[in-house]
Amino acid sequence: MFYLSEFRILKALGEAAERGVDVKIIADLNKDAFGLEKNGSPNRPALCELKEDYKDINIRWYQTSGEQFHTKFIYFKFKDKNPLAILGSANYTRRNLDNYNLETNLALEMEKNSDIPREMDKYFKRLWNNEGGDYTLPLEDHYEKRFFMRILWKIQEKTGLCTW
């Protein structure tokens, strides 16, 4: 996920983890964006605080080298229903979800035993487990605990005074 910082989304993810849902997030480090060096906001302060508030949530960083993990991909696996994927252009920030940017997302419900969900599972597991390469890093490798960064993220997310 490129940007994940919208308060309601974070809370819903945390509450799902508390209910026993296996929530796994692979997020961009927000250290680079389109050739410019960034300070890690919003993902690092948002997701590190999410982990502190909800211990059962699982988060890894996508390991980038000057590029960004620009993915906007959410995949839901259910016990008794068909899998669902949400794909598109929207980041999960207030500015994007409250229509400040023109974005399009698509919800794709798939047959449980079809090729698409199997391929999505395989892709996610490869990244999560670093199968065949070094794709992701533990959350702790780039843990953001600075008070200033946490406050800055919250102010920017709340007001929309940011580029994300």
Where in this protein do the model-derived segments appear?
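Short, glycine-rich nucleotide/cofactor-binding loops
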Residues: 1-6
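PLD/PLD-like phosphodiesterase catalytic module centered on the HKD motif
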Residues: 7-164
